[in-house]
Amino acid sequence: MDLVKNHLMYAVREEVEILKEQIRELVEKNSQLERENTLLKTLASPEQLEKFQSRLSPEEPAPETPEAPEAPGGSAV
């Protein structure tokens, strides 16, 4: 019985370490994405932010076909 218990404890410890590493990676990735999001918000024009916010509002359905992204400066070329 001790052999089974020891094996299970070892397997659980191993799995916990794997999960801890995955959590560390996900936290790091989340922080990176949050920094990127903040940077993009600061670089976006008020018109771009308004357009983005309108796409997120639940009253209006999102367009089925993606639009071409606008070039910096506000006009699509």
Curated annotation (Swiss-Prot):
Region (Disordered): 41-77
Predominant location: cytoplasm
Compartments where located: Cytoplasm; Nucleus
CDD domains: ZIP_TSC22D3
GO BP, sorted A to Z: regulation of transcription by RNA polymerase II
Keywords: Acetylation, Cytoplasm, Nucleus, Phosphoprotein
Family of this protein: Belongs to the TSC-22/Dip/Bun family.
Assembly description: Can form homodimers, however it is likely to function as a monomer. Interacts with AP1 and NFKB1. Interacts with MYOD1. Interacts with HDAC1; this interaction affects HDAC1 activity on MYOG promoter and thus inhibits MYOD1 transcriptional activity.
Protein name per Swiss-Prot or TrEMBL: TSC22 domain family protein 3
Organism in which the protein naturally occurs: Sus scrofa
